[in-house]
């Protein structure tokens, strides 16, 4: 839901934060992380003026930077703690990664487009984020050498249950992912029960680009 265009970035950010609270993003740590992450750093020049809209925007390689509400909702659903090691599937612009880095100990993030990964790494350097570890690779495979993770966030739609990723989660960890084969998917929260099983909660309907196997040439 895009709010009216603001006259200044400061006014835009203020309106965006109010919109997020109204839609149910209420975790103080998550709100602070979003407020301190300059979204305009992650948006292409063509869309700079729309950086503070609550809407998804196109980026390179046919991908998108997610709607801030979805970033807030997914981050909040992870129930992060400062000690958490987080795996993110799909770095994209790096915006979601940067938000995660402000509410967790370490963020491991995988991107299949080398172009996007390099651009995101440059943005992390600008922000001085030293707790983000990047990898160029197939996100669907996860990062077995660094597993298990406290939390896993998937930022592209999985057509089936993300079993390979669930196997890299700690027994009482949490994974949040959009799952579905059509243009509209269900955002699901998998919570480990400590015994090898999971409880699954459907949070809402979402629209994400699909997870693709392998790595890209770009």
Swiss-Prot record:
Database matches in Pfam families: PCMT
Localisation: Cytoplasm
Family: Belongs to the methyltransferase superfamily. L-isoaspartyl/D-aspartyl protein methyltransferase family.
Reaction(s) the record says it catalyses: [protein]-L-isoaspartate + S-adenosyl-L-methionine = [protein]-L-isoaspartate alpha-methyl ester + S-adenosyl-L-homocysteine
E.C. number(s) listed in UniProt: 2.1.1.77
Cytoplasm is among the record's keywords: yes
InterPro entries from the UniProt entry: PCMT (IPR000682), SAM-dependent_MTases_sf (IPR029063)
GO cellular component, one term: cytoplasm
Role this protein plays: Catalyzes the methyl esterification of L-isoaspartyl residues in peptides and proteins that result from spontaneous decomposition of normal L-aspartyl and L-asparaginyl residues. It plays a role in the repair and/or degradation of damaged proteins.
Keyword Methyltransferase: yes
UniProt entry keywords in alphabetical sequence: Cytoplasm, Methyltransferase, S-adenosyl-L-methionine, Transferase
Broadest EC class assigned to this enzyme: transferase
Single biological process term from Gene Ontology: protein repair
MF annotations from Gene Ontology: protein-L-isoaspartate (D-aspartate) O-methyltransferase activity
Native source organism of the sequence: Caulobacter sp. (strain K31)
Protein name (Swiss-Prot/TrEMBL): Protein-L-isoaspartate O-methyltransferase
Active-site residues from the entry: 66
